């Protein structure tokens, strides 16, 4: 799964100061305003880890002091990556902190069950106890990955997004939909408010796939041979793009020669494989239709932020595809959607910033 319903969990070391820590929040004692701590954003392909500190006077809630991106398949688990990251601090101005880090916020697709973060798209299980004990972490809090990303979008500067669909007027004040295809299909909704915004994590990627034309009906029939429930994530993800390509090769009566989502994307952009081009066209059309549905469902008048590893690579293709027409094609709601812009974010450190900012906000008295 790309992500599941909102889960917050804090694992505390057995010390009196942490006795009040429990699932559902950060607990009795978070990091002080100027106390550096670890924050990680873990996806199925990459994990991004940062050393952060609160920055109440800045445009974002935290400053990132040190940052590194890891390829998940190159490591045996998140604990090993965190140990490596802390080891890297030896060569930085923050070397003295290596033995002083007591708090960690993790944004991760999945949900917490007992000691583990459970998600089928991660290449390995994540043990909360292993992280806590291996690094001497007194407190580890887990937030859904797209929940963290949505939290961070409120701190985006104007130049940090690129238009997919522009509107004549500025977006209205209201909920912002944040979603994107990666290893899975994640989504969350930012709900503006005071004194602070709230975020609704969703299971939207698991909604049943709704074909919009005869070709998509044929594809759905092929997908249903594997299982009765076919979700949007089954098509709108890296693995989903590969499945679309395989299905279209079968419908075209041609062999499937491309073996990875990256190969399908490259062939589609180069125009060297007809089935790959059609697969990416179907992908973009389904994405536009689904995004439009979610805007209506959540009343996302504040706009849409698209994220995900594949989207920056295909942005010109996406703009030229049927994405916009499928997005607007909601009958009497077309005029409504024409007032809701869609923009692309290349999130980089945003998941780390979102997890860390949420962690600070959840401190008692924050």
Task: Name what the model sees in each region.
Residues 11, 18-20, 24-32, 139-176:
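Conserved phosphate-binding catalytic cores of ATP/NTP-utilizing and phosphoryl-transfer enzymes
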Residues 34-35, 136-138, 172-176, 185, ...:
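Short coil/turn connectors at secondary-structure junctions
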Residues 91-142, 151-160, 312-316:
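Short beta-strand-loop/turn "lid" adjacent to the catalytic site in phosphate-handling enzymes
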Residues 163-167, 171-232, 315-316, 323-328, ...:
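Glycine-rich phosphate-binding loop of actin/hexokinase-like ATP-binding domains
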Residues 72, 119-122, 141-148, 167-171, ...:
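Active-site nucleophile and cofactor-binding loops and adjacent substrate-binding regions
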Residues 1-100, 218-366:
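ATP-binding/phosphotransfer module of carbohydrate and carboxylate kinases, centering on a glycine-rich
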Residues 54-59, 120-125, 156-164, 192-200, ...:
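A glycine- and small-aliphatic-rich helix-loop capping segment at beta-alpha/alpha-beta transitions
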Residues 106-111, 180-183, 301-312:
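Glycine-rich beta-strand-to-loop/alpha-helix junction loops that act as flexible
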